[in-house]
């Protein structure tokens, strides 16, 4: 009896290990990374398609991302939004991983037309109905010059489809924007794309969607542990990253 039990346990361990290896081989992980901070982020300004550069803090965030990513394992490809804040973040990561960066316009942030460059206080004054809808709920009016939600959903869905078709397994990295990461998560996880964007995504954060035999899973959300170090504050003093505040955190 003891030998039978040991034999059954040995078979279960072997079978479980074999399934683990099999699932690992068939697993695709998509790392969605938000760009480092810009001055407009720090000022709480809407960015959208506006091509704002990383500030010094954002560059340091990108360097810390670049130092962390080799620990995550080998990557097969790096894709990035063509906007400078995302592409520069991706370049630093690419240098660390020894991979070129592939620009992809489908990773652009959603254009918000006439709202770009404005703070929440500006929007409250100039577009009160938009401000009310964002903060109180309800349907907001059309913003002149904005990208439609339908177009936004379509391009992010196409990106997910193409990545999964090209990379059946392994790790792929995409450096993009807060709003775009939200929509990529919704489409990648087969969630309702008509709902308000639900996820808080910090600058230089890591988010992981995994596809395997059991479908799509969210494995990591808004991880910034690589930023838990000292930064130089506005007055020149060193401050803990966790204590620094970014106004209007929902601004992408």
Regions found by a protein language model. Name each.
Residues 15-16:
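Short hydrophobic alpha-helical segments enriched in small aliphatic residues
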Residues 219-252:
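Acidic, His/Gly-rich catalytic cores of divalent-metal-dependent hydrolytic chemistry
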Residues 27, 87, 95, 157-217:
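Active-site-adjacent alpha-helix immediately C-terminal to a catalytic or transition-state-stabilizing loop
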């Amino acid at each position: 009896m003891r030998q039978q039990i040991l034999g059954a346990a040995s078979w279960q361990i072997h079978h479980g290990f074999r399934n683990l290896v099999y699932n690992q081989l068939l697993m695709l992980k998509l790392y969605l990374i938000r760009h480092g901070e810009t001055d407009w982020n720090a000022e709480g300004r809407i960015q959208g398609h506006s091509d704002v550069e990383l500030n010094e803090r954002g560059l340091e965030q990108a360097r810390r991302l670049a130092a962390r990513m080799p620990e995550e394992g080998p990557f097969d490809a790096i894709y990035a939004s063509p906007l400078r804040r995302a592409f520069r973040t991706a370049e630093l990561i690419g240098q660390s991983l020894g991979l070129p960066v592939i620009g992809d316009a489908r990773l652009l942030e959603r254009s918000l037309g006439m709202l770009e460059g404005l703070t929440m206080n500006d929007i409250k004054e100039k577009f009160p109905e938009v401000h009310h809808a964002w903060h109180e709920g309800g349907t907001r009016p059309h913003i002149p010059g904005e990208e439609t939600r339908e177009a936004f959903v379509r391009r992010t869905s196409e990106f997910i489809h193409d990545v999964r078709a090209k990379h059946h397994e392994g790790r792929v990295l995409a450096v993009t924007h807060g709003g775009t990461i939200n929509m990529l998560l919704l489409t990648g996880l087969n969630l309702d794309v008509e709902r308000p964007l639900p996820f808080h995504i910090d600058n230089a954060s890591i988010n992981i969607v995994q596809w395997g035999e059991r479908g799509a899973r969210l494995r990591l959300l808004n991880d910034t542990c690589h930023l838990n170090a000292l930064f130089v504050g506005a007055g020149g003093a060193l401050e803990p990253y966790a204590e620094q505040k970014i106004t209007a955190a929902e601004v992408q």
